[in-house]
Amino acid sequence: MRTRQTARAAILSTLVVVAGAARASDLFNVNLAETGNPGNRLFVGSSSLPNLLENLADQTGAFASFNGVPFAANLTYAGIDNAIAIQYDPTGGANGGEVIRITSLLGSDATPTFDRANGDLGNQIRDFFLKDDPDAIKDFLKQVNRRSLVAVTDGNPLATTARSARYKFERFGIHTDFTTTEGELYNRFSVDHSARRARSPGANGGETPGAERAPLDNLPVHQAATPIRTRFHFAAQYIDAQSFDGYSFDLNTSFEYVFSEHVSAVLGFPVGYHAVEDADVFNGGVHIDVPVRFIIPDYGSPYGLTWQVTPGVSMDLSGSVDYAAGGVLWSGGVNNTFIFHLDRLRIVTSQQLTLHEGQKLKINDYEFDPGVSQQILKLGAKAAYSLTHKLEVYGGVTYTDFLKDSAIDHYWSPTAGFSFVFRNGANITVGYEGDFADDFERHGGRVGVTLPF
């Protein structure tokens, strides 16, 4: 008899382990045990925290077998074990009715109690996370950002802070040269550098050439562009973070007005969407930046230096009902970029610091407060080589460091591809982009289009 009981216990333990492994990739998991009978257990996973908690409180769906049964439950949130602890008592409420309590909430002292006498338990616990106590959820999300590799607003390459900093860095830093200035077009298309090199000192017995500041005979002049530059950048990437899979899409649009060769103003609208284990996250933003080029190459020279400094501000927002997370972030920062023009070779180095602060977001009855206060440092370099006047190849890498507490301290982002430059200032780029950190990888492609209007 004892042997059979031991065998049954072993089988039950095996099933529990298998069930847990089967749910390991779910973003949110509940480990449930009957009060006073810990052998009666249940594991349930979901891609939506509000739906999971609502079904748990009402004992519906996958929790139907625990209807009317007292239990204690621990919830894993986006890879964080025991982020939420819950107790249910079918007779502990007012007039002997049902009651459910949150006994532990990561980062918060809140221990709310939901009584059947006040309405449906599932609706009450759902509303707690989505709108009723934004201060408690703010403290909770602060800790999530510091521990989860796939948090919504901060602490990883998918987060709102990282997306905001990345837009600015790519647009005005490592890929700023994809928006070609008038002087760069002139030097690229309207000066015969091969003839110039042939007449350089040493090529003709030490003869010194005259100033080369106008197109040479029979050379087509580049087409002058309007003061408007419109730029689109689309990226699609696959996500592998810890035990989670997903995908992300970004479409960044910017409109630049060129006041002179030295000063422009840019209005940007980055938007993004990503899904992790079917949990949806939406991002958007409005950026205002002013690139100032203190140094530009001389007209007619294949060599020179561009020094550009770009201060800017932005409002970024994100939202995910599945995560019960999101909010509005204000940010400001400055990018410093040097471009070394070395005939066919172009080297870009860029440094950037941005500050990000959270602001409460209210949509209808829902309230989100991201609880974010972050600083992000980005350092990057890229080399581009012109195979022909219009075709070039490029490759580079960016280092990103979250200067305040975060789940991912830093990560690397390589990029490589081709760029097609046209005489009127239009540009098309196709390439690879990735992000690499401990237990986090993202791979994908980018397509960029710059239009001279």
Language model features by range: what are they?
Residues 228, 245-251, 280-288, 305, ...:
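Residues that define the transmembrane beta-barrel architecture of outer-membrane proteins
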Residues 230-236, 267-269, 307-311, 347-351, ...:
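Membrane-embedded beta-strand positions of outer-membrane beta-barrel proteins
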Residues 236-240, 255-257, 271-277, 294-296, ...:
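Transmembrane beta-strands of outer-membrane beta-barrel pores
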Residues 251-257, 271, 286-298, 313, ...:
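Residues on the lipid-exposed face of transmembrane beta-strands in outer-membrane beta-barrel proteins
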Residues 302-400:
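Detector for outer-membrane/organellar transmembrane beta-barrel domains
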